[in-house]
């Protein structure tokens, strides 16, 4: 029975590790969030990216300028397209992105193949909208 329980726990851990994990670090109250990011929006994001061991591989904060891109059309890794959807301006999230939603088997620059990536990302702006627009 113990062996069966351990096996089920192992399978659960594998399944959980293969999915995008989203943690809310800074939330925005509903009455202050009148618009949320959606696919097709041009958004600006400040972020810091780390490997699982804590090694920082990229940071818009260190450059002093957020990155802007169109959400949901493949301009960035899938983990970002999925994890930055339905965010309020000013919201900050921690995204733990498995390799198949990042750079997969190929890796890029300082990011090794099959790496799980951890980002802290803050939505700075949604182009063409104001904080007072309706959803």
UniProtKB/Swiss-Prot annotation:
Motif (Prevents secretion from ER): 132-135
Stretches that traverse the bilayer: none
Activity: how regulated: Inhibited by both FK506 and rapamycin.
Entry annotated with the keyword Aminoacyl-tRNA synthetase: no
Function: PPIases accelerate the folding of proteins. It catalyzes the cis-trans isomerization of proline imidic peptide bonds in oligopeptides.
Annotated PANTHER family: PEPTIDYLPROLYL ISOMERASE
UniProt protein name: FK506-binding protein 2
The species this protein was found in: Debaryomyces hansenii (strain ATCC 36239 / CBS 767 / BCRC 21394 / JCM 1990 / NBRC 0083 / IGC 2968) (Yeast)
């Amino acid at each position: 029975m113990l062996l069966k329980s351990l096996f089920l726990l192992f399978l659960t851990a594998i399944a959980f590790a293969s999915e995008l994990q989203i943690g809310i670090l800074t939330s925005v109250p509903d009455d202050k969030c009148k618009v949320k990011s959606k696919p097709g929006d041009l958004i600006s994001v400040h972020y810091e990216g780390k490997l699982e061991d804590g090694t920082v591989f990229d940071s818009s904060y260190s450059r002093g300028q957020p990155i802007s891109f169109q959400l949901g059309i493949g301009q960035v890794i899938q983990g970002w397209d999925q994890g930055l959807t339905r965010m309020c301006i000013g919201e900050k999230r921690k995204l733990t992105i498995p390799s198949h939603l990042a750079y997969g088997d190929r890796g890029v620059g300082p990011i090794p193949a099959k790496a799980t990536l951890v980002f802290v990302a803050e939505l700075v702006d949604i182009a063409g909208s104001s904080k007072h627009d309706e959803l």
